[in-house]
Structure formats: structure tokens, C-alpha cells
Amino acid sequence: MSKVIGIDLGTTNSCVAIMEGTQAKVIENAEGARTTPSMVAFTQGGERLVGQPAKRQAVTNPENTFFAIKRLIGRRYDDPLTQKDKGLVPYRIVGGKNGDAWVESHGKQYSPSEISAFILQKMKETAENYLGEKVTQAVITVPAYFNDSQRQATKDAGKIAGLEVLRIINEPTAAALAYGMEKKGTGTIAVYDLGGGTFDISVLEIGDGVFEVKSTNGDTFLGGEDFDAKIIDYLAEEFQKEQGIDLRKDRLALQRLKEAAEKAKIELSASMQTEVNLPFITADASGPKHLNIKLTRSKLEALVDDLVRRTIEPCKAALKDAGLKASEIDEVILVGGMTRMPKIIETVKQFFGREPHRGVNPDEVVAVGAAIQGGVLKGEVKDVLLLDVTPLSLGIETLGGVFTRLIDRNTTIPTKKSQVFSTAEDNQTAVTIRVFQGEREMAADNKMLGQFDLMGIPSAPRGVPQIEVTFDIDANGIVNVSAKDKATGKEQTIRIQASGGLSDADIDRMVKDAEAHAAEDKKRRELVEARNQADGLIHTTERTLSENGDKLPGAEKSAAEAAIAELRTAMAADDVADIKAKTDALAQASMKLGEALYKAGQETGGPGAPGGDSGASEAGGEKVVDADFEEVDDDRKKSA
């Protein structure tokens, strides 16, 4: 039975884990790290880089290096948050053909699902290299406050990456699962999850293997990226005051600022002051300019105070929905890299009135929980029941543009709910069902998930036809909606896609593209390996020629030199087969050199040759072996 992997597809970093027996294990990637930067880059030569290699070249290739792509997944291009993001990143965000936010590199457009799929492929390969077998199934985590469009887009990313996504699981729920499996206790816990791009708060009851989510809340555009942006603005403004140059207008400088801001933020979790030092950050007519600014922890805390306070309102809402007071929470679990910040820890402590639990690794606990859920689905982990909730209310638009809820937020999923509606006009033969998700009273103020038409309704006065609308939310939190005319039995069903999201044809094309990229990556690896092998053979052959040139016949020597020249020419091109053929030819020429040397050794009776001296010599009764020591016979000892 093949393994199910658990993947935490994070905004900043991603992580993969598997179940080994009763324990979850986080797998190290090819670079030896337990987390992988959620970054994808395309080089000038068309090569695709994922993870650490992409991060390493970001400063010199900012326009084609994609990070924090999770913040765009399932979002419309005209969404105000998308427009805000455009000013924060050095890469191009464009409107896709379906109206969603896409990104562009070297003239080619990619959906956020496709970029995410490249990261998922990297996690899949990491697991396959460790297990030594193919992996086809996964549990992938998403922020609890992700809407249906974002969940569907994440599931699409899994499909593009060649994975069957068995379950989409909420990140705080996964963290609670990992915590609960270790603690084996009972009680009410709150999971405060502040990551690179999103914030979630979930309240759960744990007991006897049952993990029941009571409520969840959050902000899908609040995380470490926003904290970094505050530092970037501060550094840029200080530099502008001093030098009169706005670094944010220079994409290369902006990328260097971003890396420096992230580093400073991390350092200030452990120390009270740090220095941001960026030599040659820009230049003007007077020459190069250097940035050197001291940043204290207190200054950082002042800069991000509004962001920290923004996490409190969702906490209040989650407690209210769960019908609990802060004092009734038994344990607060901190998840996400941002929770290492002392200001966050202090804020959580003040709000909940207790010291938060910091015994879990905030970067890995979500992937561990996903692996455990994979074990539950495969039957490897027994006596665990996970009851999650839908984060946002679902409903349809009714007369006057009112949002009529069919399923309230924090309803346990999977769930199904039906309600009967009627026509608004006399002799109306068709109705358009518009599906929305959100908490506002008017439909237009909420997120539209999609729409469909129910046709062929018999003519009748308004209010007479009976149209039954059914909402069905599966365990992944993904919505299916159907509408049925009770008189005729006619039914129309849709699986809600990200409004204008990826069609099946889009996904199939992207799957093929991803497979092609994987094939290209394999070819590139083969090319590098072939060049390395050729380079090694050239080196050893040239050494043989330089050390033994005087002992080699001219013909063999010339043949080897010609083979080296031909191989060097082949190495300059990208034809793997040609490089291998020329490498084989040089190997043959090199073998002939070896034979010629062996023959020359025989003819001269050289050391080690049959019939030649083995390296020992006798002279004057004195026997010397390999010049290491001397044996003197007894007669000579006496005469001495």
C-alpha cells in the first residue's frame, strides 16, 4: 500500500511528513532542510527552480521569482487585496483570461494553482526520494479561513502536481491533531496560527480521540509578509530622507530590502537590536549609495502594532461563536513562524490570560497533523475522529439582492441543507441561482462563488413554482449546489469553481505542462551528469598525457587529444546523447593510452612489469626493499 503524504503548503515555507508506524516523520529535502521555501523561479534560459535554488537567485532575478503565491490563489484580479499585493512584490501580477489573478514570467502566464503545483511537486519528490517509491496520494492543508474558491484552487494545484488529494484539512485543525496525538489529554484548546501570509484562530474540544472544531475565524491577508512590508517601508523611507532616492521603485533594490527585512525581523526575536547593512544598494550621479540603518525591537514592535492588534478581533469572534470566555480555554497552541515574535507571545498571553503552549515546532506541526490525517484515512491511525467546520456562511441571492443563508458559519462538515424558493415574476420559466459565501446581509458585499440557471420551469403566477435549492459541503469544505423544480423534477447541479476558476481543460493542460517541466528537469539533470562525467574523464586523460607524454606513441597521443577536443565541443552544446557518445570515444582512446603505457613498461622491463625488477635490488651483499629499510647480513655486522 503506497504512503499518503501530509503537505503543509505554506505562504513562505512548505513542509512534508509521513506516518512511520504510529509516529509522524518530517522529511528533509535534497538540500538537507526540513522546510522548503515556497518559491518558484524561471531563469533566462527557461529553467525552472523551486525552493532554496529559487530563493538563492531571487536578488538577481526578482521579476521572475514568485513568492507568497498562496495569497493570490483563488483570488480575482480586481480584488482590492490583489491590487494591494501588486505594489508589494517585484514580479508581475496580471489578469488571467478567467478574471482571476495570475502571474507572468518571460511572456508566459501562470495561474497561482500552477505555481503552487510546482512547489507540491518538489514536496512529492522529497517524499519519493526518502521512501524510494512513487507517491500519488496526499492530504494538503489550507488556512481555516480559506473560502471555497481558495480550497478548490488548492485542490486543483494538487491535481496539476500529479497527486490525488484525499483531503483538504484546515491548518489549525492539523496542528491540534498533532498536539492532541502527543498529549493524549482532554480539554478545550485554541490554536493561534500566524504564518507567512494568513492568520487563523480555531477553538477545539479534544477528548477520547475526538477532535471537534467549535469555531474558526481569521484573516487570509495577514501574516509575516505584511510584517516584512512594514519594515521595508520604514527602511525605504529612512533611506529616502537621507539620500532622496525611493528604493521601492527599483525591483532589484526592493528584493534586497525584502530579504534584509525578513532577516532583521527574525534576528529581533532573539536580540534587542540589529543592523541592516546593504552596500551598493543603488547609485546616482554622485556615485554608489549604501544603506546602513539600526533597527531596535521596540521600533519594530511600534511599526507592526496595528498588525498584531488585527489578530485580536478574530480571536474574540471565535470565542463568541464557540460560546466560551478566554478563561475557559485550557491551552493555547502557537503555530506559524511569526509566533516566535516576543510581541505576539505577549499579546496572546494578555488576551487569553495564560502562558501559551510552545512545545510544538511551529514550522512543522501542521505537516505532522496532515500526515496523521493521512494515516486516519488509510486506516493506519485508529480511534481518531476529526470534526471540522465551514468557516463562512453559505447562501444565495434572493429578491432585492438579499443574502439568504442556507448554511451558517461554524457548521460541522460534511453537511447538507435544502430550502424551497419560488419565482419573483409571473410566468417566469427560468431562474438564475447566484451562490455567495460571507457574513454580510447583502449578497453583493459577499464573495460570489458562482452561478447557474435552472431552465424549463412551467409558466405560473409568481410564488407558485417550488424550487428546492440544496447545498452540500464535503469534508474538504468544498461546495456543491443543486436546484430542482419540484413540479417537473428537472435538476441542475454545479460544483462551485473559483469564480471564473480553472476549468477541467485548463487543469488537464497544466497537468501536461507540469509533466513536461518534470521531463525537462530530468533532461537537465541528465545533461549536468553527462557533463560532469565527461569533465572527469577529460581531467584524468589530460593528466595521463602530461605525466607520461614521452612514453606514449604519437598516434595514440594524437587520437586522445582529438577525442578530448571533440568532447569539449560536444559539452558546449546541450545534446546528451552526443556528449555520451564522445565520452565513450574518449574512454576508448584513454584505454588505448593505458595499453600503450603497459606495453612500454613491459618492453623496458620497468617496475612492476612481468620479468622486470619488482623494485628490490641487491648490491654488494646488501638487500634493500622499496628503500624502506635495510637488512645487513651477520658477516658484515661483525666486520663493522
UniProtKB/Swiss-Prot annotation:
Keyword ATP-binding present in the record's keywords: the answer is yes
For this chain, the annotated S-S bridges are: none
Any Pfam family the entry gives: HSP70
Up-regulation conditions: By stress conditions e.g. heat shock.
| Record-level Gene Ontology MF annotations | ATP binding; ATP-dependent protein folding chaperone; unfolded protein binding
Kindly list the positions at which Phosphothreonine occurs in this protein. Answer: T198
Q: Where is this region: Disordered?
A: 600-640
Renumbered to this chain, the Gly residues biased-composition regions fall at: 603-614
Which keywords belong to this entry? ATP-binding, Chaperone, Nucleotide-binding, Phosphoprotein, Stress response
Is Phosphoprotein set as a keyword in this record? yes
Could you name the domain of life of the organism this protein comes from?
A: Bacteria
**PANTHER family per UniProt:** HEAT SHOCK PROTEIN 70KDA
What function is annotated for this protein?
A: Acts as a chaperone.
Protein family: Belongs to the heat shock protein 70 family.
Q: What is this protein called?
A: Chaperone protein DnaK
